[in-house]
């Protein structure tokens, strides 16, 4: 059930939360861990309970990895379409978890799937958000060659979100992969241009440029840290903030 706020003023009115498909695997090697879904539903419910409007984009890497098949000769467009279907499956699972927690949610797909999801319509999405429903955007942008990170940034801009929150397995952006390099240092704050110049690999080039060109702040944080999401929305300094540099 959506929990009521504890009296703190939320810093953001509307957010776009980007989850990787791999995040839904939990400790499994493939598929969806129901415990992870339930935990994410609880955390999203806390945000709804304090009046924050939540849009969600989920990747599909836990169900389908197109890179290996593409390398083996599969047509890239076909692989990308299969990846879009994987994101729809994840979106349906997340909607189910939210509804079981008594949180109203709707899936809007960029590709038409009559009887399964609603088709994406910006004006309808805005109305659902204003009605305190969680809107889960599925099937990426609906076009091949675009990542779900790009889709998340695009949807955030379209719905006039205050920030993109990218949930990862590490607590921010580092100079190198902290799992491989024990000397990697964490950044608390970066500009879009610094991310591009340093080739930090936070998101793909298209996604970062979209955020930069439309002045959309981006925060990268560790989704496995209890309370991190709520802390960010209350103005806490979790992870790494990426935004426009000073002119």
Curated annotation (Swiss-Prot):
Inhibited by UTP. One of its GO terms (biological process) is UDP biosynthetic process. Pathway: Pyrimidine metabolism; CTP biosynthesis via de novo pathway; UDP from UMP (UMPK route): step 1/1. Keywords: ATP-binding, Cytoplasm, Kinase, Nucleotide-binding, Pyrimidine biosynthesis, Transferase. It catalyses: UMP + ATP = UDP + ADP. One of its GO terms (cellular component) is cytosol. Belongs to the UMP kinase family. This is Uridylate kinase. It comes from Pseudomonas fluorescens (strain ATCC BAA-477 / NRRL B-23932 / Pf-5).
């Amino acid at each position: 059930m959506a929990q009521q706020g504890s009296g703190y003023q939320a810093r953001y009115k509307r957010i776009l939360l980007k989850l990787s498909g791999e995040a839904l695997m939990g400790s499994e090697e493939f598929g969806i861990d129901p415990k992870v879904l339930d935990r994410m539903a609880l955390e999203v419910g806390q945000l709804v309970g304090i009046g924050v409007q939540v849009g969600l984009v989920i990747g599909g890497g836990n169900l389908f990895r197109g890179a290996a098949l593409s390398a083996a000769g599969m047509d890239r467009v076909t692989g990308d379409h299969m990846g879009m279907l994987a994101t729809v499956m994840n979106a349906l699972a997340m909607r189910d978890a939210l509804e079981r927690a008594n949180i109203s949610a709707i899936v809007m797909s960029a590709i038409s799937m009559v009887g399964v999801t609603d088709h994406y319509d910006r004006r309808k999405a805005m109305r659902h958000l204003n009605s305190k429903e969680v809107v889960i955007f599925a099937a990426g942008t609906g076009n091949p060659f675009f990542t779900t990170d790009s889709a998340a940034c695009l949807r955030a801009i379209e719905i006039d979100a205050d920030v993109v929150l990218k949930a990862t397995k590490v607590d921010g952006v580092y100079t190198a992969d902290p799992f491989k390099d024990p000397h990697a240092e964490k950044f608390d704050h970066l500009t879009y241009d610094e991310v591009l110049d340093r080739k930090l690999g936070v998101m793909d080039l298209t996604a970062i440029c979209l955020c930069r060109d439309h002045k959309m702040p981006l925060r990268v944080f560790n989704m496995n840290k209890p309370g991190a999401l709520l802390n960010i929305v209350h103005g806490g300094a979790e992870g790494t903030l990426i935004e426009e540099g000073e002119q």
